[in-house]
């Protein structure tokens, strides 16, 4: 085998792989987290919803889940562990006698919805 053939064969394989890579990546599902519009921040059943992020689901579904989460909470100091098939965890911070802020993460399979809210007590 000539030296030219030995050197050019691996290069041809690399070129073919490089040509196919963009099409393989284009078929991969997008699961990037996106920021969703809150709209009327007081329409969720809590004092103020500050932000909503969705991954693997639509913003419309994320807003619906946030409303269901706050409907599930029994009162201002209540918590909701699961809603609409999602498992939810909550971390409260900036606590005072008048209010607290909270970060909530709800997950189901590859879908995740995160939101933050302020609750006056």
Question: Residue ranges of each PLM-predicted region?
Answer:
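Bacterial N-terminal signal peptides that target proteins for export
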Residues: 1-11
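Bacterial N-terminal signal peptides
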Residues: 10-19
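C-terminal region of N-terminal signal peptides and the immediate post-cleavage residues
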Residues: 18-34
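Extracytoplasmic low-complexity, Pro/Thr/Ser/Ala/Gly-rich segments
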Residues: 29-66, 74-92
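Extracytosolic low-complexity repeat regions of secreted or lipid-anchored proteins
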Residues: 64-121
């Amino acid at each position: 085998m000539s030296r030219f053939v030995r050197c050019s064969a691996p290069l041809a394989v690399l070129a073919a792989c490089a040509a196919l890579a963009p099409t393989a990546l284009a078929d991969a599902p997008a699961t990037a987290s996106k920021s969703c519009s809150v709209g009327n921040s007081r329409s969720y059943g809590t004092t103020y919803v500050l932000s909503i992020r969705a991954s693997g689901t639509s913003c419309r579904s994320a807003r619906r889940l946030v409303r269901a989460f706050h409907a599930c909470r029994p009162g201002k100091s209540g918590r909701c562990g699961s809603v609409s098939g999602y498992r939810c965890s909550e971390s409260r911070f900036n606590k005072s006698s008048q209010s607290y802020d909270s970060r909530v993460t709800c997950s189901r399979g590859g879908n995740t919805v995160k939101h933050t809210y302020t609750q006056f007590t």
